[in-house]
Amino acid sequence: MRKINKLLVAATTTALILTGCVGGKKEEQKVDPNKKVEITYWDFPQFTKDKEFSKTEDFDAALIKAFEAKHPNIKVNYQKIEFTDGPAKIETAIQSKTAPDVIYDAPGRVIAWAAKDLLVPLDDVDKSKLNEAAVKASSYKDKLYMYPQGVAPFLMGVNKDLTDKLGVTNLLPLDKPGRNWTVEEYEKFLKAVKAKDPNITPALFYTKSQAGDQGPRAFVSNLFNSWMTDKDISKYTINDENGVKGLEWVKKAYDEGLLGQGVALEAKDALEAFKSGRAATTILFSPGTAASHASGFNYKFLPFPNNSGKAKYEYLVAGPAIFDNGDADKAAAAKKFVDFMINDKEWGKRTLLASGNFSAKKDEKGLYDSEELKFAEGLTDQFGPYYNTIPGFAKMRPLWFNMVQGVLNGKTTPKEGLDKFVADANKTIKEAL
C-alpha cells in the first residue's frame, strides 16, 4: 500500500503540511523530516490477543519500541484509557487543547470530531485498496479521517453442544449456502428448543438499555429485510412495511415465550445466559464476544434470519485517527506512526491480529485458521449502511429501546411505536446539524 505520508525521503527534503490549532484556522507550515519530535498516543484495551503480549499496554509498548527503532527521531508517549471513562477523558483533553496526536478508536466518535474540524485528513491513503464499507464509515464529506484497520460483523451465535443435546441441530442452517435462513425456519427452530426443554430460553431479546443495542436493532431490521436508515444514511426508515412486519413478529414470538423475558435485561444478561447454557442462541455475537463468552463449548456463528435470502450486518470498524494539534511536525510524525501500525511488514499484521478483527484491506484475507472465523470473515460484502456516524446517533439510542419496551409491554402497537420512533429519531438528526 502506498504510504500515508511521503516524508520518508532524503534527509534534506522539506515538505509542507496543512495544519493549525485544534478547531482553528489551517495554515501551511514547513516540516523537517529529521527533526526530533514527541507525539502522544492514546489507546483503549484493544490489543489483547497477541501471542506474546496479552495486555494492551504491553503490546502497545512493544509496538512503540519497534516504531522508535525505525524512527529514532520520533518519541511516542503512551497512555492507556478505559472504555468506561476514556471517552470523557478525550473530550476533556480536547477542551483543554491537550488532545493526543494519535487515537485508536471507532467511527462513532472519530467522525464527530472530524465534523468539528479537529482531525487531520488522511488524504494520501489509497482508499481503493480498502473495504468500501469501512472507508465510508471512516470518512466525513468524502475525506478519510480514520484509517480503517480492522472490521468485524455483529451477528448471532448458537451453542451447538446444547442443540446437539436437545436434538435440534438439524433445524439450523449450518449446511445451507451462507448459512442463510428464513424467519419461518428460525421460528421452527425456536419452537423446537422450547418444546424440548422449557427451562432453556431459545433466544433472549433484550431491551433494557442501549448497551449492545446493535443486536436487537439488527435483529428487527433483518427479519423481513428492512434497515434502520436509508442507504444514504440521511434519515431513519425502519417504520417501512418490512420494519413493521419485523417488530410485529418479535412481539408475537415474545408473547409465545420464544424470545425470553428481556424487557428488564440488557446485553450482558443475554450473553451471560448464552455462556452459562441457559439460552441456546444469542442475537449479539462477534469474534470478540465468542472469545469471551463461548470458550467453554462448541459455538457456531449464525446469520440473522432474513426473508430476502441474505442477512445484512451491523459491524465494527477500528483504526487510528490523528488530532490536529497545530504542529506540522507532530502531524507528520503521527502519520508515520499510523502508517507503521497498519502497513509495517511485521507489525501491521501483528497489530491487526492482536485486535482479533478482520482486515479492512481487500487483499488481506485468510488470517485465521478457525472455521468459524473464516465464515465470519467472508461476510464483509453483506455489511449494511453504517449509521453510527449519523448526526444525533447518541440521542436516537434511548428512543429505540424505550419504544421497543412499550411494544413488548403492550402499551403501543409495532406500527405506532415505529412511526413515533422514526419521527423522533429524525428530529435528532436535524437538532444535531
Label each PLM-derived region with a short phrase.
Residues K80-K89, R179-E185, G262-K275:
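Short helix-initiation/N-cap motifs at beta->coil->alpha
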Residues A69-K70, K75, D255-E256, H293-G356, ...:
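Extracytoplasmic/periplasmic substrate-recognition and gating elements
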Residues I238-F297, A333-F340, E346-K349:
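Ligand-binding pocket segment of bilobal, Venus flytrap-like solute-binding proteins
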Residues L302, R350-N402, G406, K430-A432:
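Long, aromatic- and glycine/proline-rich binding clefts that accommodate carbohydrate-like moieties
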